[in-house]
Amino acid sequence: MTPKNFEFQPGAILHDAIVGTFRAHGRSFEAWCKENDVLPSNARNATFGQSRGPKGRALLARLIEAAGPEFLRLAYARRIAEYADTVKKGAA
């Protein structure tokens, strides 16, 4: 899968990665929402996968683009790997 067609799985890990990516760039999730006339609750619903309709998917795409897809992909992959390690340790 190339970075161009990489699909993020909505959920807590993606939400944390998006928030972290904004912070890493000196911005905030809430500030982006305010600048873009988006209710933070709607943005959270999109990142957590609670809003999977056309509007929710479009909002998620905007958030991913604003966060920086390449940097976000790295942050997301790191968080997924950390979670997988936690699961492995818990299952042992």
Explain the meaning of each model-derived region.
Residues 33:
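The alpha-helix within a helix-turn-helix
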Residues 1-24, 72:
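A short, Lys/Arg-rich alpha-helix, primarily the initiator
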Residues 55-74:
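DNA major-groove recognition helix of helix-turn-helix/homeodomain DNA-binding modules
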Residues 38-53:
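Recognition helix of helix-turn-helix/homeodomain-like DNA-binding domains
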Residues 19, 30, 61:
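Residues within the helices of the helix-turn-helix
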Residues 71-92:
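Short, charged recognition helix plus adjacent turn
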